[in-house]
Regions:
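Extracytoplasmic
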Residues: 1-101
Length: 101
């Protein structure tokens, strides 16, 4: 949504093999990633720095009808890179936000 909207924007209808890409981040000592999701999905998000690159972590996602935080350990090399989240599993979910920890 627009700046100041009361309702937050999010990515909806994420299904099997959907990939979301975000550019660019200065990765320094990133050891975990936290995401906030909801929906009727069971699986995980692969975390990569390239569309078809190495998987640096997997963030679990389960069925829930309210926004839920999930955290996973990641092993992302230091440096400036993009982030790609690819959903692997069944059903569909929405992604509200993510945080590098």
């Amino acid at each position: 949504g627009r700046d100041g909207d009361e309702v937050p924007s999010y990515v909806a209808e994420i299904t099997k093999n959907t990939t979301l890409g975000c550019k660019y981040f200065d990765m320094k000592n990133v050891n975990q990633i936290k995401i906030k999701t909801r929906g009727y999905a069971n699986g995980y998000f692969e975390v990569k720095t390239k569309w078809d690159g190495e998987v640096y972590g997997k963030i679990p996602v389960e069925f829930t009808n309210f926004w839920t935080e999930n955290i996973a350990e990641v092993n992302i090399p230091d440096g400036i890179s993009a982030l790609y989240f690819t959903f692997k599993g069944d059903g569909n979910c929405s992604l509200l936000e993510f945080e590098l920890l």
